[in-house]
């Protein structure tokens, strides 16, 4: 009963969505020959990607912001997911990313993941409102999978 799982069904993805997600997921996952079969399934014949922590961080934030929008979250709801204490105060009983928040504040002087995820969410929202495509500062991606995007993509036409 996949309908009960908390993620969008493949039919919910448009070809544009797939073009956004697939190269990012491939680059995050395919960093070793151990997962060659996964890369091949996506249509990638090149080698594994280098482990670049800054690039990986940004790709993860792009995906997080993309999925927050795909789920239909408002900015305030997305902020609540990232840092409920900012909305409800420091005594709010639950935080999803408290340990990450503390580590990043200690290391960077800010909750960097929250800031970048919100900035990307805002930029994606601006692009959607202007009816233009979000362009990543990482473009062009190291891999292009357009040729591999076809029948495996969901039938959604969002």
Enumerate the predicted regions with their spans.
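S-adenosyl-L-methionine
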Residues: 1-158
């Amino acid at each position: 009963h996949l309908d009960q799982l908390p993620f969008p069904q493949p039919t919910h993805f448009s070809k544009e969505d797939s073009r956004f997600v697939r190269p990012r997921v491939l680059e995050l996952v395919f960093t070793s020959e151990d997962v060659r079969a996964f890369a091949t399934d996506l249509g990638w014949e090149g080698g594994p990607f280098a482990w670049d922590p800054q690039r990986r961080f940004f790709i993860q934030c792009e995906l997080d912001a993309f999925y927050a929008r795909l789920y239909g979250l408002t900015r305030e709801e997305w902020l609540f997911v990232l840092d409920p204490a900012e909305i409800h105060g420091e005594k709010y009983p639950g935080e999803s990313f408290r340990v990450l928040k503390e580590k990043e504040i200690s290391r960077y002087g800010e909750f960097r993941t929250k800031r970048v995820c919100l900035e990307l969410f805002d930029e994606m929202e601006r692009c959607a409102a202007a009816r233009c495509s979000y362009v990543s500062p990482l473009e062009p991606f190291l891999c292009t999978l357009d040729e591999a995007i076809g029948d495996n993509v969901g039938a959604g036409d969002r």
